[in-house]
């Protein structure tokens, strides 16, 4: 299996490098195409009207590419630019920090994986729900061991690992996306010369819906959430056709 590995933390991020080593040792053909610098929270943005520069880096089993663009750029370039063999799977991560609930819309990690889906390649996004993690090996091993069981299809699987030692994980839950609600989102500050500014911060409110990814990780479980790119509200679609007296063009 050819695996394209990318992220939004940058080419040299320990989560990505640990995942590369783990998957390569498991016998997979792994290729890295990742941003050349930190690109967190860039969502699904792509680079227009600017060139994309790539820098080659030697890997134990081939060549990796650091790209001057966004995470989605990396996946587009890898697949549509044919700088690596066509992948059978895109894996984005391991991210430094969680990608849970509605935060996936801001996530460069999840968006890179979704770009693979849009280009016809199954994808996985992997995040470790800690901003101070130093050991990504348990998360990487979980991914490697889970690959044969995930029944990869045309969509995306979003995996979040709890911020706990592996022996303290309570298990695995298959979940739906929660709604990340933040408290105290903006801090009002003053710059040295007196100019006011705002610093985006905030903490996520505790989740109470036990079916969600937020709740699972909050309680110490690994969360696995299947996702797809179709954002259509089919209930509203039907209601609007009826209320506007429009016939279904597909009938």
From Swiss-Prot:
The keyword Cytoplasm applies. Coiled coil: none annotated. It comes from the Bacteria. Its cofactor is a divalent metal cation. It catalyses: a ribonucleoside 5'-phosphate + H2O = a ribonucleoside + phosphate. Binds 1 divalent metal cation per subunit. It is found in: Cytoplasm. It is an enzyme of class 3 (hydrolase). The keyword Cytoplasm applies. GO terms for molecular function: 3'-nucleotidase activity; 5'-nucleotidase activity; exopolyphosphatase activity; metal ion binding; nucleotide binding. Belongs to the SurE nucleotidase family. Nucleotidase that shows phosphatase activity on nucleoside 5'-monophosphates. This is 5'-nucleotidase SurE. The lineage of its organism: Bacteria, Bacillati, Bacillota, Clostridia, Eubacteriales.
């Amino acid at each position: 299996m050819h695996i394209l590995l990318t992220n939004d933390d940058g080419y040299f991020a320990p989560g990505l490098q640990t995942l590369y080593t783990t998957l390569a040792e498991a016998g997979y053909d792994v290729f890295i195409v990742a941003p050349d610098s930190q690109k967190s929270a860039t969502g699904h943005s792509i680079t227009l009207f600017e060139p994309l520069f790539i820098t080659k880096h030697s890997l134990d089993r081939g060549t990796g590419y650091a790209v001057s663009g966004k995470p989605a750029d990396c996946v587009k370039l890898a697949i549509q630019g044919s700088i690596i063999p066509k992948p059978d799977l895109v894996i984005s991560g391991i991210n430094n920090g969680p990608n849970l609930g509605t935060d996936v819309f801001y996530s460069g990690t999840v968006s890179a994986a979704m770009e693979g889906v849009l280009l016809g390649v199954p994808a996985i996004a992997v995040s470790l729900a800690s901003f101070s993690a130093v050991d990504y090996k348990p998360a990487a091993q979980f991914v490697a061991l889970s690959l044969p069981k995930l029944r990869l299809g045309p969509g995306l699987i979003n995996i979040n690992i709890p911020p706990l030692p592996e022996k303290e994980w309570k298990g695995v839950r298959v979940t739906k996306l929660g709604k990340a609600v933040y408290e105290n989102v903006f801090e009002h500050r003053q710059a040295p010369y007196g100019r006011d500014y705002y610093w985006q911060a905030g903490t996520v409110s505790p989740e109470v819906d036990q079916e969600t990814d937020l709740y699972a990780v909050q309680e110490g479980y690994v969360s696995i959430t299947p996702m797809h790119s179709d954002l259509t509200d089919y209930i509203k679609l039907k209601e609007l056709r009826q209320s506007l007296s429009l016939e279904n063009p597909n009938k």
